Amino acid sequence: MQLAQRLCELLMCRRKAAPVADYVLLQPSEDVELRELQAFLDENFKQLEITPADLRTFSRDTDVVNHLLKLLPLYRQCQSKCAFLKGYLSEGCLPHTRPAAEVECKKSQRILEALDILILKLVVGEFAMSEADSLEMLLDKFSTDQASLVEVQRVMGLVDMDCEKSAYMLEAGAAATVAPPTPPAVVQGESGVREDGETVAAVSAFACSSVSDSLIPEETGVTRPMMSLAHINTVSCPTVMRFDQRLLEEGDEEDEVTVMSPSPEPVQQQPPVEPVQQQPQGRGSHRRRYKESAPQETLPTNHEREILDLMRHSPDVPREAVMSPTMVTIPPPQIPFVGSARELRGVKKKKPTAAALLSSA
């Protein structure tokens, strides 16, 4: 019943105000923000000694207060973020997350430092921020700077690593090219050590890589190098060929020449020398073998035998002298060493005549 009555009064606008009514006047929001800002400044900027009277003065300048109020939540957010990252780094941070946490912590510290400068300049009045300059742009600037610094450090690290690797490769290449000098090779033959590798450099000056075998015949008097010419592909060494005197070509008996070196001493008879073993000779030999000088023993020829037969039948000649003929020893002719064996090739050995045999007997 009462509800219907009140509804009718409300519709007919007949309701009156109660005689006792309590109205509470709420404080404006600006005072709450100023108190919060005062607490923030006392907490972080106590050294500035900003009093409430100063804040009332600042309140007259709405731009300064508005900017300070905008910076307040951002500052507290960066503070909490930096405190969390410092605690995370100090309490068992994972190895793979430590670089990222360090970067974010440094970024938060840099933002806090920049906000400190902004607040100080706003309070002092030497800095004014326009409405167009938002805090997002400021954060983007600092984040871009931090990212740029990180990228620059990363690039510098890669450059340093590249320099180290390049230096290592260059040092390794130089050590490989500069090898220690090899000792000279010593060539040994039948007569012992001949000469070092520098002298006996028996390589061809114009050797071709297509040569499959040595160009020096096996039966010549020229010693072969240690390796065949097929393995030589350089033209840096001169041609040095050694002549072996023991491998001279021996011709027939009529063309054989006996050569001895001249000496001021008188020629003496020497004991017989063992015959030299004949070795196979090649076609390209242009030298002749020098045999050691020794006296030659010759047998009587047919003409000498006829003379001996006549002397046996002659009664005036003693029989012992005829029956026991001695071997005639002919000393070697003293021919001086003139020219090469090719030049001496034309010298023929003269056969002893009967008159020479008789005179020697």
Curated annotation (Swiss-Prot):
Where a lipid (S-palmitoyl cysteine) is covalently attached, the residues are C8
Q: Where is there biased composition of kind Low complexity?
A: 266-281
GO CC terms in record: host cell Golgi apparatus; host cell viral assembly compartment; viral tegument
Q: Which Pfam families match?
A: Herpes_U44
Cellular compartment(s): Virion tegument; Host cytoplasm; Host Golgi apparatus
Claim: Phosphoprotein is one of the keywords in the record? yes
Region annotated Disordered sits at: 251-299
| Main localization of the protein described in the UniProt heading | virion
UniProtKB keywords: Host cytoplasm, Host Golgi apparatus, Lipoprotein, Palmitate, Phosphoprotein, Virion, Virion tegument
What modifications does the entry list under PTM / processing?
Phosphorylated. Palmitoylation is necessary for Golgi localization.
InterPro entries cross-referenced by the UniProt entry: Herpes_U44 (IPR007619)
* Role according to the record: Plays several roles during the time course of infection, including egress of virus particles from the perinuclear space and secondary envelopment of cytoplasmic capsids that bud into specific trans-Golgi network (TGN)-derived membranes.
Quaternary structure, from the entry:
Oligomerizes. Interacts with UL103; this interaction mediates UL103 incorporation to virions.
Q: Which family does it belong to?
A: Belongs to the herpesviridae UL51 family.
Protein name in UniProt? Tegument protein UL51 homolog
Q: Which organism is it from?
A: Human cytomegalovirus (strain Merlin)
